[in-house]
Regions:
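Short coil-to-helix segment of the ABC ATPase nucleotide-binding domain corresponding to the Q-loop/switch region
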Residues: 1-8
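ABC nucleotide-binding domain "signature" region
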Residues: 20-32
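Conserved signature/switch motifs of ABC ATPase nucleotide-binding domains
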Residues: 40-43, 61-62, 93
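Hydrophobic anchor residue at the start of the ABC signature
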Residues: 55
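Catalytic Walker B motif of ABC-type/P-loop ATPase nucleotide-binding domains
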Residues: 66-69
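Helix N-cap at the start of a conserved alpha-helix in ABC-type nucleotide-binding domains
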Residues: 77-79
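Conserved catalytic loops of ABC-family nucleotide-binding domains
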Residues: 86-99
Length: 136
């Protein structure tokens, strides 16, 4: 289930208190708009909902860094925009998000971009400057 997916590692690997982890997971599901999906299984979720579950899972423990590899790549525009709105909110709260994307429009949302082209690292202070050539 969604809840098991979010809580297994903190409870069994990190040995955190089960009640505390479940409370935190429920709060995260509310923030992700998934409070009614706690007992759902992956086959019952949309792609965007699965991505939001993955973000909630990564957020347990209130990390200061989130790594996101193609977080919108398999999503339709609406779901991708929802994920980016979540990232904007997290960034506004002080979280650092490192995101890998091939989508120039998604890269343009970043405060800072790094582009890799033909194995060479290129840095751009402005997301629009060179985002059309992003091959990261």
């Amino acid at each position: 289930s969604v809840m098991k997916n979010i809580t297994d590692a903190p409870i069994h690997v990190q040995k955190r208190d089960k009640e505390e982890v479940y409370r935190e997971a429920r709060e995260l599901l509310m923030k992700m708009g998934l409070e009614d999906k706690e007992n759902a299984y992956p086959c019952q979720l949309s792609g965007g909902q699965c991505q939001r579950v993955a973000i909630a899972r990564a957020m347990v423990g209130n990390p200061t860094l989130l790594l996101a590899d193609e977080p919108t790549g398999a999503l339709d525009t609406k779901a991708g925009n929802q994920i980016m709105e979540i990232f904007r909110h997290l960034s506004d709260q002080g979280m650092t998000i490192i995101m890998i994307t091939h989508e120039p429009a998604i890269a343009a949302c970043a405060d800072k971009t790094y582009h890799i082209l033909d194995g060479e690292l290129r840095t751009s202070a402005e997301p629009e400057g060179g985002a059309d050539h992003a091959e990261a």
